[in-house]
Structures are given as structure tokens and as C-alpha cells.
Amino acid sequence: MNLILLGPPGAGKGTQAKLLIKKYRIPQISTGDILRAAVKDMTPMGGKAKSFMDAGALVPDEVVVGIIQERLNLADCSNGFILDGFPRTVAQADALAKVLSGLGRSIDHVISIVVDNEELLERVTGRRTCRNCGKGFHVSFDPPKSSGICDECSGELYQRDDDREDTMRKRLEVYWQQTSPLVEYYKNKSLLRSVEGVGSMEEIQQKIVSILQG
């Protein structure tokens, strides 16, 4: 099963990917993680990516796609994979389709986790992180016993820059600008299924599994 997970920041893609990994025993491929690994291991494409990164430039699509191809060739992807964070644009989706075609494979499902912006803002801006041990809390959904203090180590809790409202609004704006055409792209290929990302982790997981097994 070859699966793409789409969804805005804070929608719970990472959580759902971890649950799907356990259930289907296929790897999650996060572009950020494999890019860093390819650079560290100095794979052919990792070496190319490093030259762009060292120059402070964005790594071009063809290099990112090449790194994904290197990853898909590894044995643990033989029964499928979950792509998280890629593709983000129609051009990337086209490039991915060509790579998969060359491997004799194709995407089976594209799951879009849908959550409205105000819900996402509440989820993300309420996050707090311990400066000392890194444990996460949420002011509404998982508050610490004492305000601003970590339950585990009594460290100070703070709000990461990425979790601030102005930053999150910008991230959402960029996401929707990039991804709206991608949603249409996969809808036109009859691959896209949308799942409401509201409810417990288990409830959302069950909705996704129902689609995958349907």
C-alpha cells in the first residue's frame, strides 16, 4: 500500500502516520528526515542536496525527488510506504508519479485530513514545551498541574516560535496556497479521500482504516 497523507500543520498527520506504521508495518517517509539522513550518509543525491544547503539555497525539486527515489529503493518499502510532507505542489506530484512509474509502482490512496483554521490555531497556539526536558503540554487539552511549570522536571514551559499565532497563520496561508491545487490534482485522479480530523486519535484512525480497507 502506497499512501500519501495531506493536511495542514497541526492536523495530526504525524500521529496518524505512527498509528498506520504499527498497523500496516510500512515505513513513514518524512522528507525532512530523509533529506537530513541522505546528507549525513552522503548518498549521491545527499551530496547534491548538501551543496545547495551549504550555499543557503533551497534544495530543488529534482534533488528532493531523487532522495525520495533512493529511499523507496530500500527493502523496507517493498510492501508500501506512507509519504508525509511530500508532495506539496502539483509539480512535485508529477515528478513523484514519474519516479514511481519507473519503479513499477503508483500511489494507491491520498488521505487529506481536514481541520478548519480556527481549530488548528487553538491546537497549535496552546502548545507549551519544557525548556529543560522537552516534554509537551497544552493549555486546554493537556495542562500542567502548575501553570507554566513542567510536571516531570519542574522546568519552565514556553511557547515555541512555530506555535505563535502570527507564525501559524502564515504557515496556514502558505499551506493552502500550495496545497489547494494538489487536492484538486488528486481528486481528478480519483485518489483523494478526505477525513475530518476532529475527534480522538482512535476515531480518526478508524475513519482512515475504513477508507484503506474499503
Curated annotation (Swiss-Prot):
Pathway field: Purine metabolism; AMP biosynthesis via salvage pathway; AMP from ADP: step 1/1
GO CC term, one of those recorded: cytoplasm
GO BP annotations listed: AMP salvage
Places the protein is found: Cytoplasm
InterPro entries on file: Adenyl_kin_sub, Adenylat/UMP-CMP_kin, Adenylat_kinase_CS, Adenylate_kinase_lid-dom, P-loop_NTPase
Catalytic activity reported: AMP + ATP = 2 ADP
Spans annotated as LID: 126-163
Keywords assigned: ATP-binding, Cytoplasm, Kinase, Metal-binding, Nucleotide biosynthesis, Nucleotide-binding, Transferase, Zinc
Residues that, per the record, bind AMP: 31, 36, 57-59, 85-88, 92, 160, 171
Entry binding sites for Zn(2+): 130, 133, 150, 153
Principal location listed in the UniProt entry: cytoplasm
Region of interest called NMP, as start-end residue ranges on this chain: 30-59
Residues given in the record as ATP binding sites: 10-15, 127, 199
Enzyme class, broadest EC rank: transferase
Pfam families associated with the record: ADK, ADK_lid
EC number: 2.7.4.3
Function: Catalyzes the reversible transfer of the terminal phosphate group between ATP and AMP. Plays an important role in cellular energy homeostasis and in adenine nucleotide metabolism.
Subunit structure, interactors included: Monomer.
Family: Belongs to the adenylate kinase family.
Free-text comment on this protein's domains from its UniProt entry: Consists of three domains, a large central CORE domain and two small peripheral domains, NMPbind and LID, which undergo movements during catalysis. The LID domain closes over the site of phosphoryl transfer upon ATP binding. Assembling and dissambling the active center during each catalytic cycle provides an effective means to prevent ATP hydrolysis. Some bacteria have evolved a zinc-coordinating structure that stabilizes the LID domain.
Protein's name in the database: Adenylate kinase
Source organism of this protein record: Geotalea daltonii (strain DSM 22248 / JCM 15807 / FRC-32)
